[in-house]
UniProtKB/Swiss-Prot annotation:
Keywords: Cytoplasm, Methyltransferase, rRNA processing, S-adenosyl-L-methionine, Transferase. Specifically methylates the N4 position of cytidine in position 1402 (C1402) of 16S rRNA. The keyword Cell inner membrane does not apply. It comes from Colwellia psychrerythraea (strain 34H / ATCC BAA-681) (Vibrio psychroerythus). Belongs to the methyltransferase superfamily. RsmH family. It is found in: Cytoplasm. This is Ribosomal RNA small subunit methyltransferase H. GO terms for molecular function: rRNA (cytosine-N4-)-methyltransferase activity. S-adenosyl-L-methionine binds at G35, G36, H37, D55, F80, D102, Q109.
Amino acid sequence: MELDTTHISVLLNEAVDGLAITDDGCYIDCTFGRGGHSSVILSKLSDNGRLIAIDRDPTAITAAEKFKDDKRFLIEHQGFAALAEIAEKHELTGKVDGILLDLGVSSPQLDEAERGFSFMKDGPLDMRMDTSKGQTAAEWLAVADVEDITWVLRTFGEEKHAWRIANAIVDTREETPLTRTSQLAKLIKTTAPQREIKKHPATRSFQAIRMYINSELDQIEKALVASLDVLAEGGRLVVISFHSLEDRLVKQFMKKHSQGKKVPRGLPISEIELNKGKKLSLVGRRLKPSQTEVEENVRSRSSVLRVAERLERNTD
């Protein structure tokens, strides 16, 4: 199968600007994808600069071969939850000038029916980011009980009809195994009323199952926490989210670590003491794609970019 390289990086310039790149700096692209952001980062680095990319999708590792002769670049085939371990392996803990996280599913993953991410194309019900390991969506749906399926649909998809859909899945699999995306999409469409005119009834359920299969929120949380140790003082953390669950997690993390100690009013405490515990400084406001970008790439419409800067460690 020919590798699909048609992915358009969302908020490309805004994300790279947020990194505030210095030509001899060290950066980590936690979601290489097809290398859109990495290409621009490399174009801004001198021979002394360095870029480490991370991706758990085998097709992304293949796509990274275009940089194999660039001594400034290397890629690690892992999930970005391993950020701390990767930085330690390369002796970069506390030395990285910028970390980029571009969350969600890439266009090639959605467009390739065999990956099983899309309800718009028939394919095997897989949904794994890393196809070399782990449980597929079909395998999980074959054994999960109604309560577990309901919890996943509600927690990761905010699906109001979760119980109804979960019951339909369990009832259906007793007669016919659910192994194809088209089967699941049709089942959901006939089970749950359409909530939004422009949104397929299966949208939230597919998102929820994908996020559960890939432990996406857990991966994000681990990477965010690791970034505090991996970043150098003044290093930038840039995160692009694509739905409210991701963005809420990022927003709360950045807010938490950009605030100092909470103390009662009126106490005679110095500014240094008040700032103790602050690890991040928020950089600007959240950014959304321009109307032009949305028109050129409709998948960018829900994206949100947030930036924070690592503070001096004597305030930790």
